UniProtKB/Swiss-Prot annotation:
GO terms for biological process: positive regulation of canonical Wnt signaling pathway; protein autoubiquitination; protein ubiquitination. The keyword Lipid metabolism does not apply. Pathway: Protein modification; protein ubiquitination. This is E3 ubiquitin-protein ligase RNF220. Residues 485-513 form a coiled coil. Residues 514-522 are annotated as: Required for targeting to the cytoplasm. Residues 277-297 are annotated as: Disordered. Auto-ubiquitinated; leads to proteasomal degradation. A zinc finger (RING-type) spans 514-553. PROSITE patterns: ZF_RING_2 (PS50089). The gene is RNF220. It is found in: Cytoplasm; Nucleus.
Length: 566
């Protein structure tokens, strides 16, 4: 049962030696194997086994020759009981006495021996457990892992992050000695410093610590928290100096921008806005982003200054022109005012106080005491200047002789209309005689060649129109009757006139008709007032009744009629 239990515990991962699971210890073991001198006597490889007295075959692990104790845990040299030639302390070996070789001494007090931890570890008190250091976490602090020229303190936490503190401690100071002693004590207790390391020279310890630190910290390189750049341990100091230089340059750049902004001619509003912008900047902004923002702001500010200067130049040019104009006008007004003042002064000197006699006494007129006289007192004074007369001729009658020629018709040519009542006819005859001044009436149109059958105007009543239609005769019938009544000579002349009229009608084709008689134009006349065209008889009869155009009722006089030829 004991052998089975031992084999089960050896196969189970939880009962294997715990230091094998730590990569740091494996690196230390490989380093010790490589640096070990071949001249050191080695013990005979001894496989794991059981007492010889056991006769029963049991499945025991690591019975093969390749899985020897020396291959798993490096061979120990030297005389038993001494630790001068060991590559790493025996406290790192976690084996039960029954699996350990006879010459292995596990007596030193350590946290990794069989009396401290393991499958066969006895129960310990709480104080003992708390005083032990875990072998699964890297050391809290490494000693002599830096150059002797620039000593630093480097710390690493359980996650593998390294913290470099640039505190310069001289090697001869008490602080450095205290740190070295404390570090040696801590690492000696934790079992990470062998006796040979403690007794060797400082140069050897520095080399070994550099190798161990590189092996420990190569798995996770540090990153700059400002610019997020992946750094090596050897580059930390140089990068920190660069960041400090950039941080020192930021206030100088801001001061230079402020000096540029304080140049003469800068308005207060811009300075206020710049100060507000600087106050409103986020304190958590990175230096690189703030530097780029300042550069962009300076470029924008320079552009603004250039645009403002150009605008002010244009405005000043316009204002200068306006000022010159105002100065010229002011000089002119000043000269005029000076002349007026001189005239007023002379006038006031001559008539400063107007005097007049009253009852043998001289008195001063009160209005002369007022500044400006009546005008200054508020009274309206009429100027003695007379407006110049204009020599332009005013045409009231509207003489159109130059444009349309001499009048061709007069009031004597108008054909008067006969009224139905004899009283109205007498009044019209009297008015006509007054207009003609006793002159004879015109004989342009005789009743023989008139288009109208009688002298009366056409009536709109039905009864009278029927009677007139019965009595009316056309121009052709009347001509025929007159021809029959007259002699043969007159008849012959009338026929010739009729033939000529018919020929004219045939030649014209009756394309134009008068709107009054609805017949072809016998002698067309037009008015220079409205330019309407009617027959001569139609115009004269219409003007005899009223002085209006029969088509548009425009006031028309007989002198406005002109003969036209179609």
């Amino acid at each position: 049962m004991d052998l089975h239990r031992a084999a089960f515990k050896m196969e189970n991962s939880s009962y294997l030696p715990n230091p094998l699971a730590s990569p740091a210890l494996m690196v230390l073991a490989s380093t010790a194997e490589a640096s070990r001198d071949a001249s050191i006597p080695c013990q005979q490889p001894r496989p794991f086994g059981v007492p010889v007295s056991v006769d029963k075959d049991v499945h025991i692990p690591f019975t093969n020759g390749s899985y020897t104790f020396a291959s798993m845990y490096h061979r120990q040299g030297g005389v038993p009981g001494t630790f001068a030639n060991r590559d790493f302390p025996p406290s790192l070996l976690h084996l039960h006495p029954q699996f350990a070789p006879p010459n292995l001494d596990c007596t030193p007090i350590s946290m990794l021996n069989h009396s401290g931890v393991g499958a066969f570890r006895p129960f310990a008190s709480t104080e003992d457990r708390e005083s032990y250091q875990s072998a699964f976490t890297p050391a809290k602090r490494l000693k002599n892992c830096h150059d002797t020229e620039s000593p630093h303190l480097r710390f690493s936490d359980a996650d593998g992050k390294e913290y470099d503190f640039g505190t310069q401690l001289p090697s001869s100071s008490p602080g450095s000695l205290k740190v070295d002693d404390t570090g040696k004590k801590i690492f000696a207790v934790s079992g990470l410093i062998s006796d040979r390391e403690a007794s060797s020279s400082p140069e050897d310890r520095n080399d070994r610590c550099k190798k161990k630190a590189a092996a420990l910290f190569d798995s996770q390189a540090p990153i700059c928290p400002i610019c997020q750049v992946l750094l090596r341990p050897s580059e930390l100091q140089e990068h920190m100096e660069q960041e400090l230089e950039q941080l020192a340059q930021l206030p100088s750049s801001k001061n230079s921008l402020l000096k540029d902004a304080m140049a003469p001619g800068t308005p207060k509003s811009l300075l206020l806005s710049a100060s507000i912008k600087r106050e409103g900047e986020s304190p958590t902004a990175s230096p690189h982003s703030s530097a780029t923002d300042d550069l962009h702001h300076s470029d924008r500010y320079q552009t603004f200054l250039r645009v403002r200067a150009n605008r002010q130049t244009r405005l000043n040019a316009r204002i200068g022109k306006m000022k010159r104009r105002k100065q010229d006008e002011g000089q002119r007004e000043g000269s005029c005012m000076a002349e007026d003042d001189a005239v007023d002064i002379e006038h006031e000197n001559n008539n400063r106080f107007e005097e007049y006699g009253w009852c043998g006494q001289k008195r001063i007129r009160a209005t002369t005491l007022l500044e400006g006289g009546f005008r200054g007192s508020g009274f309206i004074m009429c100027s003695g200047k007379e407006n110049p007369d204009s020599d332009a001729d005013l045409d009231v009658d509207g003489d159109d002789t130059l444009e349309y020629g001499k009048p061709q018709y007069t009031e004597a040519d108008v054909i008067p209309c006969t009224g139905e009542e004899p009283g109205e006819a007498k009044e019209r005859e009297a008015l006509r005689g007054a207009v003609l001044n006793g002159g004879p009436p015109s004989t342009r149109i005789t009743p023989e060649f008139s288009k109208w059958a009688n002298d009366e105007m056409p009536s709109t009543s039905n009864g009278e129109s029927s009677k007139q239609e019965a009595m009316q005769k056309t121009c052709k019938n009347s001509d025929i009757e007159k021809i029959t009544e007259d002699s043969a000579v007159t008849t012959f002349e009338a026929l010739k006139a009729r033939v000529r009229e018919l020929e004219r009608q045939l030649s014209r084709g009756d394309r134009y008709k008068c709107l009054i008689c609805m017949d072809s134009y016998s002698m067309p006349l037009t008015s220079i007032q409205c330019w309407h065209v009617h027959c001569e008889e139609c115009w004269l009869r219409t003007l005899g009744a009223k002085k209006l155009c029969p088509q548009c009722n425009t006031i028309t006089a007989p002198g406005d009629l002109r003969r036209i030829y179609l």
